[in-house]
């Protein structure tokens, strides 16, 4: 049975906007896990997130898997709106602007990872989430923007068999690894992609390649009930 709340227009608007901004903050925290594990090593962000999802009912399992940044037309817009309101009401703090800065910075860090492999870049998944065509607020486009700022053109949703490229799996897809040219690098944001070829590199974002946990994780796919 759906829960129905009766209230004023102002309460209704606040419910909608704070719902979206809360989810933005939660996604930012989840993605911070992979930013940290990318640097400290010996850690798989999916393992950490899975524990948080299941060990504490306060955290909850939805929107708690590190991956691409928060996106869509509503969440960024509502964060910007509440940032403006926080300033207008002289609250003295602005969590909402910080969430937007985190979103931007996480996209820039991901662009650095793609560029570091020294190959042409393709992003698989242009829309802001799987199963839709809408690109408003797409985190993939934000990553592509930072790549372009640093002098690297990005292609979308096409596997080129003729040259080695770095592919970002922005959506949880599983292309046949025979499609990739020799020497290609696959950066998987969801840490679920496995391949059988020795002449391509699969990089689980947030897991350092030299760590033993990286090898173990590749042979024990994570579970996700989100």
Task: Say what each PLM segment does.
Residues 1-226:
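Structural/interface elements that position substrates and couple domains in central-metabolism enzymes
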């Amino acid at each position: 049975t759906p829960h129905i709340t009766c209230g004023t227009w102002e309460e209704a608007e606040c419910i909608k906007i704070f719902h979206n901004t809360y989810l933005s903050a939660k996604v930012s925290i989840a993605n911070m896990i992979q930013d940290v594990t990318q640097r400290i090593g010996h850690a798989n962000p999916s393992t950490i997130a899975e524990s948080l999802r299941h060990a504490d009912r306060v955290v909850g399992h939805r929107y708690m898997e590190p991956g691409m940044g928060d996106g869509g037309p509503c969440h960024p817009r509502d964060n910007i709106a509440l940032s403006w309101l926080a300033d207008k009401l002289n609250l003295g703090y602005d969590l909402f602007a910080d969430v937007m800065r985190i979103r931007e910075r996480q996209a820039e860090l991901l662009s650095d990872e793609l560029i570091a492999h020294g190959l042409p870049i393709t992003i698989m998944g242009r829309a802001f989430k799987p199963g839709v065509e809408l690109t408003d607020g797409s985190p993939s486009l934000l990553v592509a923007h930072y790549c372009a700022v640093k002098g690297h053109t990005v292609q979308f949703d096409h596997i080129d068999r003729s040259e080695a490229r770095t592919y970002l799996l922005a959506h949880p897809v599983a292309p046949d690894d025979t499609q990739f040219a020799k020497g290609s690098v696959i950066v998987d944001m969801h840490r679920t992609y496995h391949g059988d070829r020795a002449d391509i590199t699969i990089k689980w974002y947030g897991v350092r390649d030299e760590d033993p946990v990286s090898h173990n994780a590749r042979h024990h796919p994570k579970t996700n009930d989100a």
